[in-house]
């Protein structure tokens, strides 16, 4: 896995919403960032107004294969019965898996219940990529803590909770 501190380290953020966009803006201060979303109108509008040369707004999932890290920041809405809707996370994992290359770091920012990463996300990534977790690609988790209306506790001031499958990956997630 390429070190996060490498100047050529490329990041894709999957999901350009209230969680993804602040991450994109922060990462783009020092890295090339692909901002990937399936909403064509959103991508076109953001791309037309983009003045940061480090950000590429796209709906082409092939950008994932050009990335050293993929940050998953898709929504996890709640059904009327208070159960989480994991459809966006599942679809993101399939898309990432289809485009995943070896030695990629994947960090899940989407909020969901314990066990989803291990029981749903990793198997989908392996199935759709034919790669093996913790050998060919690496996974971390850092639940989003962004409250869009809070101007005091912003992405730059909140303490992030992070986890990973081993100390090396944890170190890379922390540097990210």
What are these regions (language model features)?
Residues 65-66, 102, 157:
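Alpha-helix C-terminal capping/helix-to-coil transition sites in glycosyltransferase folds
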Residues 78-145:
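Rossmann-like NAD(P)(H) cofactor-binding subdomain of soluble oxidoreductases
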Residues 70-71:
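N-terminal Rossmann-like NAD(P) cofactor-binding module of classical short-chain dehydrogenase/reductase
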Residues 1-49, 56-65:
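NAD(P)+-binding Rossmann beta1-loop-alpha1 motif at the extreme N-terminus of oxidoreductases
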Residues 74-76, 111, 166:
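Short glycine-/small-residue-rich Rossmann-like dinucleotide-binding loops
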Residues 4-7, 123-140, 146-176:
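Internal alpha-helical scaffold of NAD(P)-dependent oxidoreductase catalytic cores
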Residues 26-29, 48-51, 84-88, 120-123, ...:
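Short, glycine/charged-enriched secondary-structure capping and boundary segments
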Residues 50-56, 133-137:
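A short helix-to-beta-strand connector/capping loop
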